[in-house]
Regions:
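RNA/tRNA-interacting regions in translation and RNA-turnover enzymes
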Residues: 1-177
């Protein structure tokens, strides 16, 4: 299994067609493609010679974002993203409909030019509990605005077997305070 920070930000979906960014949307299905192009950590094109269409998910956040800020404020900051405006960052963490394991997908995302979250790997569930305790003590992922950690299955076979529910994947679990 893998463990990543649960970034306190706004989930964003991106769609690339023949390597070009063609669509971006928030979890509320808000179309934000024009504004998202201003975020420097989102590639406008990727090398995708294997697939005609690729969809991925990540999180848009500000290094200074905290839980008291609203996600709507974060999205509205997209309208003001300039050289002197707020710095918004994007971490990609999932390729939809992928048959690869989690770590391979993260490597692919990096090859396409995305930043990905710090990812820890273990086969021991007790280690996940120890990492969660470290996170609570602000000793893990403390350089990021987090509101928990996420434990995920690494295996694509296990992920496909467990499937997804209407609100979240059954192969991932968020651990918070």
């Amino acid at each position: 299994m893998v463990v990543q920070p649960k970034i306190d930000g706004c989930a964003i979906g991106l769609r690339y067609k023949y390597g070009q960014l063609v669509d971006a949307y928030s979890r509320e299905n808000t179309e934000i493609i024009e504004n998202i192009r201003a975020v420097n950590t989102i590639p406008l094109s990727i090398d995708d010679s294997l697939k005609a269409e690729v969809e991925l998910e990540g999180v848009l956040f500000s290094p200074t974002f905290n839980s008291k800020s609203s996600k709507e404020q974060l999205l509205s900051d997209l309208n003001h993203e300039t050289d002197s405006g707020p710095t918004l960052l994007f971490l990609a963490f999932q390729i939809f409909c992928s048959n690869s394991d989690e770590l391979s997908d993260l490597t692919q995302l990096q090859n396409w030019g995305f930043d990905v979250p710090i990812t820890l790997r273990t086969d021991d569930p007790r280690q996940v509990k120890r990492w969660h305790s470290q996170w609570i003590k602000n000793k893990l992922f403390s350089n990021l605005p987090t509101n928990g950690i996420v434990a995920k299955c690494n295996s694509s076979l296990t992920k496909n077997f467990l499937g997804v529910s209407p609100s979240s994947p059954n192969w991932a679990m968020a651990l918070t305070r």
